[in-house]
Amino acid sequence: MEWTQIFIPIVVSFAITVSVMPLFIGYFQMKKQGQVTREDGPTWHSVKTGTPTMGGVVFLVASLITSLAMGLFFHQFTPSLLIILFILVLYGLLGYLDDFIKVFKKRNMGLNSRQKLIGQIFGGLVFYFVYRSEGFSDTLDLFGVAEVPLGIFYGVFIIFWLVGFSNAVNLTDGIDGLVAGLGTISFGTYAIIAWKQQQFDVVIICLSVIGGLIGFFPYNRKPAKIFMGDVGSLALGGLLAAISIILHQEWTLLLIGLVYVCETASVILQVASFKLFGRRIFKMSPIHHHFEMCGWSEWKIDFVFWSVGLICSGITLWILF
């Protein structure tokens, strides 16, 4: 795969997304179905009630079709490509079921946490067994300094990594355009890492997702015409975790995905502080809602969080190369 060919997956996935998204939005508007605002969410987000959701279906399908087609075209139809795409499909389906229940069954909480966790763990187990059957290493890279052999416990780590980051990205998806922008930066960084490792199958997936996210962004930027839904955010988080594992650069996701980590940490700290001390650390969690309550606009939050993601990704590449 030549560097001049990197635009092909981006353009194909982008074209599919921008072509189908207006039809998808039109369908939801015709059915008068849309986002159901959570009762524990910010009150000012009530104006977003009824906005079409599940836009992740479009850019995920575009990414899937493009990855498979380009994998065949560039002779990169590998086990790595297929197992990563398996996570895309499974976690996407989990998110789809969650969104479907919220939108069409009018239950604002969707699947319960136990149901989601069972599906996420199942995906992690399948990923691990395929990963080991293909002879991949069961050692954990510790910040490029040392490698620790985990044996069967690497399977536990894989499950933790996939579940943790799929939920982290899901928590981050609460501001118009935020995850679409952060995702583009994150997958762009992993495309560079994969290119340096000559794992072109992973490059194809990253570029396909980037094309889909770029095509989705004009419809998701404030004021959003459509949200990606859990179908998009759960799949994107699972994909990032799976890619970091396949590239054997797991630690990099802590830095590349620092915003996702901080969003999750803010929720954990908020809950722990309230239960232990009866006090809240933040005005609201995840932390992007805290900044909203401090008077920041959604665009300002987007810009600051994207900047953090870009800087952290740059530092990661500097450390590696």
Swiss-Prot record:
Chain segments annotated as transmembrane: 6-26, 54-74, 77-97, 117-137, 143-163, 175-195, 200-220, 226-246, 251-271, 301-321
Cellular component aspect of the GO annotation: plasma membrane
GO molecular function, one term: metal ion binding
UniProt keywords, alphabetically: Cell cycle, Cell division, Cell membrane, Cell shape, Cell wall biogenesis/degradation, Magnesium, Membrane, Metal-binding, Peptidoglycan synthesis, Transferase, Transmembrane, Transmembrane helix
Gene that this polypeptide is encoded by: mraY
Keyword Transmembrane helix set for record: yes
EC identifiers of the protein: 2.7.8.13
Pfam families referenced in this protein's UniProt entry, alphabetically: Glycos_transf_4, MraY_sig1
InterPro entries tied to this protein: Glycosyl_transferase_4, PNAcMuramoyl-5peptid_Trfase, PNAcMuramoyl-5peptid_Trfase_CS
Membrane topology of this protein: Multi-pass membrane protein
Enzyme class, spelled out: transferase
UniProt-listed GO biological process terms: cell division; cell wall organization; peptidoglycan biosynthetic process; regulation of cell shape
Similarity section: Belongs to the glycosyltransferase 4 family. MraY subfamily.
Cited function: Catalyzes the initial step of the lipid cycle reactions in the biosynthesis of the cell wall peptidoglycan: transfers peptidoglycan precursor phospho-MurNAc-pentapeptide from UDP-MurNAc-pentapeptide onto the lipid carrier undecaprenyl phosphate, yielding undecaprenyl-pyrophosphoryl-MurNAc-pentapeptide, known as lipid I.
Cofactor(s) the record lists: Mg(2+)
Domain of life: Bacteria
Catalytic activity: UDP-N-acetyl-alpha-D-muramoyl-L-alanyl-gamma-D-glutamyl-L-lysyl-D-alanyl-D-alanine + di-trans,octa-cis-undecaprenyl phosphate = Mur2Ac(oyl-L-Ala-gamma-D-Glu-L-Lys-D-Ala-D-Ala)-di-trans,octa-cis-undecaprenyl diphosphate + UMP
The organism of origin for this protein: Enterococcus faecalis (strain ATCC 700802 / V583)
Pathway participation: Cell wall biogenesis; peptidoglycan biosynthesis
Lineage: Bacteria, Bacillati, Bacillota, Bacilli, Lactobacillales
UniProt name for this protein: Phospho-N-acetylmuramoyl-pentapeptide-transferase
Subcellular location field: Cell membrane
